[in-house]
């Protein structure tokens, strides 16, 4: 009965995952396992490289190391459980485990929204105010911005968690997804979900749209500054500095807004699942490559690291 408790109270859920593709089970498992291991190695490797190379101890790479940390935690909050489900007969997850998985996942996602906005401001300061960059982006400000991103993400997720715990689940307990995400929980709830739908929309606007606005304003100033640079080489260097961040922002917010700015419905769950694969698995794997492949400073740091290891091995 909507809005009230039923005689049956759900204490666990069944995560369908990708069991509707039995013939592709092994192939999908190998793909997702490879993606997960690659993401872990690339993101942790980037964090270690930034940590050990003194030339990368700048605000830009401080933010990048935190982005890599978030991406590592982000994919680890969903993928291991999804991988274990490929070969488990019982694909169940407790109600507490389900809500905690969403809380962790949501906290990381919201924190990443804020961090990407902070990174855009850092690029604005570097390109539009190069002479004052060191003074503007002081170590204390960088730390405060990162701590603020984490804290704000935790707060936004905690508000959602409190609302989710007010829901009653008394009907079907099958989640047609590979992790516990809010749209799927709303579909299964036998309570009135409109208030939480509104909350979901408000959170998406505050974190998603507000972060995008900050990013757009920052890049508006950046583009204006780049157009005023006389040399082609200077323009190219400034643009390349921002291109990787713009790519990451487009991928992250594009896929996230596709899922979370739409009403929940059973008919859209197949699309949600595919979009979720993109922003929970693919994007965390691509981010370290996006920021590294055309980055001369990262390549130089890798070369210095190789030379140092080579010299130590031959001592």
From Swiss-Prot:
Phenotypic consequence of gene deletion: Mice show stongly reduced sensitivity to muscone.
GO annotations of cellular component type: membrane; plasma membrane
Annotated disulfide bonds: 98-180
GO terms, biological process: G protein-coupled receptor signaling pathway; sensory perception of smell
Compartments, as annotated in UniProt: Cell membrane
Residues passing through the membrane, by range: 30-50, 55-75, 100-120, 124-143, 145-165, 203-223, 241-261, 273-293
Protein's membrane topology: Multi-pass membrane protein
Record-level Gene Ontology MF annotations: G protein-coupled receptor activity; olfactory receptor activity
Keyword field: Cell membrane, Disulfide bond, G-protein coupled receptor, Membrane, Olfaction, Receptor, Sensory transduction, Transducer, Transmembrane, Transmembrane helix
InterPro entries per the UniProt record, alphabetical: GPCR_Rhodpsn, GPCR_Rhodpsn_7TM, Olfact_rcpt
Cytoplasmic side: 51-54, 121-123, 166-202, 262-272
Top-level taxonomic group: Eukaryota
Extracellular side: 1-29, 76-99, 144, 224-240, 294-315
Function: Odorant receptor specific for muscone. Muscone-binding causes a conformation change that triggers signaling via G(s)-class of G alpha protein GNAL, activating adenylyl cyclase.
Record-stated family: Belongs to the G-protein coupled receptor 1 family.
Protein name: Olfactory receptor 5AN6
Organism (species): Mus musculus (Mouse)
Lineage, opening ranks: Eukaryota, Metazoa, Chordata, Craniata, Vertebrata
